[in-house]
Curated annotation (Swiss-Prot):
It comes from the Bacteria. Its EC number is 3.5.99.6. The gene is nagB. One of its GO terms (cellular component) is cytoplasm. Pathway: Amino-sugar metabolism; N-acetylneuraminate degradation; D-fructose 6-phosphate from N-acetylneuraminate: step 5/5. One of its GO terms (biological process) is glucosamine catabolic process. The active site is at D67 (proton acceptor), N137 (for ring-opening step), H139 (proton acceptor), E144 (for ring-opening step). GO terms for molecular function: glucosamine-6-phosphate deaminase activity; identical protein binding. This is Glucosamine-6-phosphate deaminase. Homohexamer.
Length: 268
């Protein structure tokens, strides 16, 4: 796991955008795994800026989102399809027919939808770079604590903590879903590269458990310890409970030298 600590959240977004841009510019048909929530919004803004500046094109890119609320219409402003359209897809040249979410409408079988989503990812050649955030309880996607480390795309019941964390996004009289479709932990680990972004003091405990805690389903993000190419981008607040800050800074300086000479990716 490569841990990189930045002074602030904006620097996290800028570095994450460099990872995405290099992949898109290096690979003819890149496949991105995308996330929602507050953390990646600044990343998407950086990518939109790069597109408008002529630094990259999404025309050959395929994307798969981590999750989507169960039974919510894609046109609903609380849907993750709406989120992605508003924050990225509407502002770049990506073909929306090649942007996928694990949508499961009312009356559809969530188990069949999960299998179908896994098939679509496989048919696209797998995910090259999966973007992640992390919940305060260590969840990635909607893989809540005690999720199986071997799990695949499926329906999940959201914990009360996740519901509380997300309640600020819903009006008091607005329906808030308690179920969601999500890529599984094994699905995430299948990505060739994983890039997790975490900012703010509220994520510090989960970050510590992910990076230095035991591998455990209690902290789903700790599964990234098993990934060959996991990159963790943190601001100082999110990294505040990690020990050995000096080591992470020193290691990053060594990696910067290698990346400058050979690029961020070793197999593209």
């Amino acid at each position: 796991m490569q841990v990189i600590i930045f002074d602030n959240a904006q620097q996290v977004a800028e570095n994450a955008a460099e990872w995405v841009a290099e992949l898109i510019n290096k690979k003819s048909n890149p496949v991105l795994g995308l996330a929602t929530g507050s953390t990646p919004i600044s990343l998407y803004q950086e990518l939109v800026n790069k597109y408008k500046a002529g630094e990259l094109s999404f025309s050959n890119t395929t994307s798969f989102n981590l999750d989507e609320y169960l039974g919510i219409n894609e046109k609903n402003q609380q849907s993750y399809r709406h989120f992605m359209n508003e924050n990225l897809f509407n502002h770049v040249d990506i073909n929306k027919l090649k942007t996928f979410l694990p949508t499961c409408n009312q009356g559809e079988n969530p188990r069949e939808q999960g299998l179908d989503y896994e098939d679509k990812i496989a048919q696209a050649g797998g995910i090259d770079l999966q973007i992640l955030g992390i919940g305060a309880n260590g969840h990635i996607g909607f893989n809540e604590p005690t999720s199986s480390l071997a799990s695949r795309t499926r329906i999940k019941t959201l914990t009360q903590q996740t519901l509380n964390d997300n309640s600020r996004l819903f009006a008091a009289d607005e329906f808030q879903p308690t179920l969601a479709m999500t890529m599984g932990i094994a699905t995430i680990l299948d990505a060739r590269y994983v890039l997790l972004m975490a900012t703010g003091k509220s994520k510090a405990k989960a970050v510590k458990e992910m990076v230095t805690g035991p591998l455990s389903a209690v902290c789903p993000a700790s599964s990234l310890q098993l990934h060959e190419n996991a990159i963790v981008l943190l601001d100082k607040e999110a990294a505040s409970e990690l020990e050995d800050h000096e080591y992470y800074v020193w290691a990053d300086k060594q990696n910067v030298k290698i990346n400058q000479e050979f690029g961020l990716y070793h197999n593209y």
